[in-house]
Amino acid sequence: MDNCYDPGLDGIPEYDDFEFSPSIVEPKDPAPETADGPYLVIVEQPKQRGFRFRYGCEGPSHGGLPGASSEKGRKTYPTVKICNYEGPAKIEVDLVTHSDPPRAHAHSLVGKQCSELGVCAVSVGPKDMTAQFNNLGVLHVTKKNMMEIMIQKLQRQRLRSKPQGLTEAERRELEQEAKELKKVMDLSIVRLRFSAFLRASDGSFSLPLKPVISQPIHDSKSPGASNLKISRMDKTAGSVRGGDEVYLLCDKVQKDDIEVRFYEDDENGWQAFGDFSPTDVHKQYAIVFRTPPYHKMKIERPVTVFLQLKRKRGGDVSDSKQFTYYPLVEDKEEVQRKRRKALPTFSQPFGGGSHMGGGSGGSAGGYGGAGGGGSLGFFSSSLAYNPYQSGAAPMGCYPGGGGGAQMAGSRRDTDAGEGAEEPRTPPEAPQGEPQALDTLQRAREYNARLFGLAQRSARALLDYGVTADARALLAGQRHLLMAQDENGDTPLHLAIIHGQTGVIEQIAHVIYHAQYLGVINLTNHLHQTPLHLAVITGQTRVVSFLLQVGADPTLLDRHGDSALHLALRAGAAAPELLQALLRSGAHAVPQILHMPDFEGLYPVHLAVHARSPECLDLLVDCGAEVEAPERQGGRTALHLATEMEELGLVTHLVTKLHANVNARTFAGNTPLHLAAGLGSPTLTRLLLKAGADIHAENEEPLCPLPSPSTSGSDSDSEGPERDTQRNFRGHTPLDLTCSTKVKTLLLNAAQNTTEPPLAPPSPAGPGLSLGDAALQNLEQLLDGPEAQGSWAELAERLGLRSLVDTYRKTPSPSGSLLRSYKLAGGDLVGLLEALSDMGLHEGVRLLKGPETRDKLPSTEVKEDSAYGSQSVEQEAEKLCPPPEPPGGLCHGHPQPQVH
């Protein structure tokens, strides 16, 4: 092997002359050098994810870089082949950047056939022209060695095309090129560049074929390198209108680099994205989003689409899951269906109603004398004939279809001389039989009740003939007002459904004066009271009338909605319905103002969803709490208005209703967190003017906390004490925003406000408290020509990556960064550790004064925020532990999975 590889010839000859066309990015279809000439093709791509780049102090990888199709029990490795050629050849592979055109990468390949600068070579031929690389590893460069390695790689590359050496001008040019590469290079992504060399006439391998480039390989320790995976969803179907809230559990994602994509896999190519903000991503493992509307509102049957997680920057996607859109339910409350139904007859569902009518008519003459033409007053004559108190059981004594039996009994009692049918009454029982006597007594009582019922019905009909008032008939039949049809609707329900206002008032009047108040609150099979239906159908006058006669507004329907909740969902009619409900004087009004629905939303939250300042004013005037948090996430009305980006509502809540601009959700987010996460300069400016706290931190740590195992032996005894304190820095609005305009607003506001008191120092160390001289020296070091963009990496390590674009054009980016870090409550140890990991030992020396050295703890554990896009793996070799146990790691990190 050594005979065919000269380690002094690393790199690719005449690299600068190569024109990397888009075909190189798709290596499975390479362009040959000539129409029928030899060319290089990738047979097996490397695996894109799951492989870890390792530092030199960690030792070699356990197993080489696997192939894309590698599985347990069937290992594959990156493989290439020279086509249209047979004979001796040499194939080399090195690392290049993932951007186009590909440039030399600072990381290096390691393996049995690899040189010190990371170029691996194998010989192939003369028959088998396939090369398999089965022991490749990726050596992660340290920041302090990055420039040196880049210059060496570029020099070797240039020397292959210019063996006579480099001039001083060319060396300076290479150094400048290395500096430019360092600024833009992503240390978490590499690609393999395969190059083939055929044997020339002089016996050397100096005839190059066109290189081919592999697909990107992501460092498994990089925040954005993990495979996207949907673990669970609480809903797999929703309305075609969208807006359904879905809780999705997933593997680790980045708040600012993830989206939920809905799409159809057909010729239309429809796609849409779930609606959520960075604050809806919970600790990188759960996303709460609202479904987008389907592109067709009118569908006749359910439609199944797909959804997947997708990274915004890299475009990586997860496996797709199915989601079903169901047709729009226009008549959710089934009012229209019931209106289309034919009107019920008296025989349905009461049974025998027509016979009852005939019987009553036949008996009217017999009761004429008793009626005596007396007037009802208010149904006094009808009530006088009631044989049982209100609430007794006439329905039980009056079985359906029994009209004929009732009238027969009445004839026998009133006109015995006319020969009533004997089977209608029990036969005479023999003397001395108690059971027979008891049966006879019950039969007589039954007939007496039937007689009273018939008499009352007859009197009601007579009174109706005198007064022409339908309430006379209703009073006589008031016990039937509780009758329900197959949908559970009473006569009052049906009158409201069909909009019969006069009938509604008559029935309600009778119910009220007869003290049959239970009827007014009866529910149908959909758990709807008459008041619910009056609100659903928008009958404001009926709502007021029902409340006056005792309707209970606190009762809930099957969805958990009270009449007030339904009124707030009534669209344009909401203010009038709300007036009727709240101005009725009902004793339950204070109670319904503080009742949530089944989704945990209070009336003030529904008023925000209705986008109605008028409804908000009505609710607050009647005693609703504008600061009430909804039960799912603790959001106030101001939080919801901010999420909806309703500038008018936010202004109304802040200026007129004096909502608390610093109210917090269960996760500690203020409205300013939400506005910043949405990237809305207008809302941000409004909230800042209203006094929003720019320094407010939510409950999600900016940097993951150390595991309990790193806290020492005293962790158990100190645990309860630690639980009472907050020992980490959460995300501020500035940490959540990706908008340059919002960042500028927040930074300007931060400079114009006094610094907040620092949080209790975390276990990592004391707060950042340094003199101006030390900070100025560090600023000069980071902005100096030797640093070349180190401040940007420092920002990422300090969890302030969102500020990089903002500070890039400032006179002193590092100075602005350090001031923001200090303002945010950053600790000294975090800064020292970041500088040390970057190899900036001079900066560590500047900061480590006698007054701070003794304060530093022995443990140094720090991980990056989930908001970065590149790997921030600890890089300083000086922090590597001595070779105690095999596989020990640098910087106190827990043992990762090794590949």
UniProtKB/Swiss-Prot annotation:
Processing after translation: While translation occurs, the particular unfolded structure after the GRR repeat promotes the generation of p52 making it an acceptable substrate for the proteasome. This process is known as cotranslational processing. The processed form is active and the unprocessed form acts as an inhibitor (I kappa B-like), being able to form cytosolic complexes with NF-kappa B, trapping it in the cytoplasm. Complete folding of the region downstream of the GRR repeat precludes processing. Subsequent to MAP3K14-dependent serine phosphorylation, p100 polyubiquitination occurs then triggering its proteasome-dependent processing.
Gene3D superfamilies: Ankyrin repeat-containing domain, Death Domain, Fas, Immunoglobulins, Rel homology domain (RHD), DNA-binding domain
Any one GO BP annotation for this protein: germinal center formation
GO cellular component terms, A-Z: Bcl3/NF-kappaB2 complex; cytosol; nucleoplasm; nucleus
Tissue-wise expression: Highly expressed in lymph nodes and thymus.
Span of domain Death: 764-851
Protein name (Swiss-Prot/TrEMBL): Nuclear factor NF-kappa-B p100 subunit
